[in-house]
Amino acid sequence: MIGFARIFFIGVFVAGLGGLSLAAAYRVGGTPGAVSAERIVSVADPAESDDSPPPKAKPEPPAPTRQQKLDDLFARLAASTDPAETDGLIAAIDRLNLESGSDTGDFLMARAVAALGSQNLQVSRALLDKLIILQPGWAEAWNKRATVRYLMDDERGSMADIARVLILEPRHFGALSGMGMILERGGFSDDALRAYRRALEIAPQLASLRAAVDRLTAAVKGQSL
């Protein structure tokens, strides 16, 4: 009786610590006398209890920045072998290029683009002048003004704006294409070909760039004969 009472006391004591009942002690060891102190403590260890808190969920990764999105799109554009995919990537790049990160900047850009679309070049130019003062680091503001200045027959001013675009975003194939157009128009075929080729490296499936490179390559070869 003394031995049984002692085992019963141990079972109750362990149950108070970790939920181990006398019946569990019997199941673990087969008989009360077969349950070692180490085994009882191991079963009752709070570290191994089902009551331990669940592991903390991993935090969500931060959303990609605008620059990271552009880097990804340009990498995919350079690797693309499908003209249809190229068109989609270019459209996505154009949308990101039109995002300034500022409501005011986006508003002015939208008005400038609308004025450009309706051939109201003076209004578009004035809006872009203001936008460049507000956000001089926005490559697309300079690019749009380069377009407006070209349409206003200000090729020197357009080239100056294109140079600024390419400092801010060297992968701007639209600016490189515009540079090629101006150089070709001025009779600088070699320089124009270099600009077109650089643009084609960035967007190798863009048909208009391929046509320009092929045309000028033939022209330059003809001049050297």
Where do the protein language model's features map onto the residues?
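Residue-level signature for tetratricopeptide repeat
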Residues: 76-79, 114, 148, 182, ...
